[in-house]
Amino acid sequence: MTQPTIGVVRSGGRKTANVCVKLVPSSNSSSQIIVNGKPASTYFQDNAVYLQNILTAYELVKIESQLLKIETKYDAFIQVIGGGLSAQSQAIRLALCKSFLEIYPHLRSYFKKRGFLTRDARIKERRKYGLKKARKAPQFSKR
């Protein structure tokens, strides 16, 4: 499937997952989400939690466009590198929300209230020498 050249491009991240989202006006009546060349439902193995992470941004924009009587659908072409499926879905949500803000700047308060514009900076802590894991120490013996 060829990707159109016009549209909005934004990136997002979570843990070690990095995402690049290209948002393009849809040529047909329905919008589609393509992740690494596959439909989102196939890529995320029909997992409702991961799909809901992504679709919440789409739902907010859909409701807002109905209120403003705008009938524009968008296709999302997404490239994901690294991380697990959960981190990838959260990174996609962040990048999608950033993309939709380019088109609908008045949605910032909606996305901000729900925490969709904040990158979760928590990552795995590194292992320290002398310890078994990041914080787990070997058993201590007094005698």
Language-model-detected regions and their locations in the chain:
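Contiguous, often N-terminal, cationic amphipathic patches that form binding interfaces
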Residues: 1-74, 126-143
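Short, flexible coil/turn micro-motifs enriched in small/turn-prone residues
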Residues: 7, 32, 77-82, 90, ...
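Mid-chain, well-packed structural core segment of small domains
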Residues: 65-97, 101
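Basic, glycine/proline-rich low-complexity segments that contact nucleic acids
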Residues: 86-89, 93, 97-143
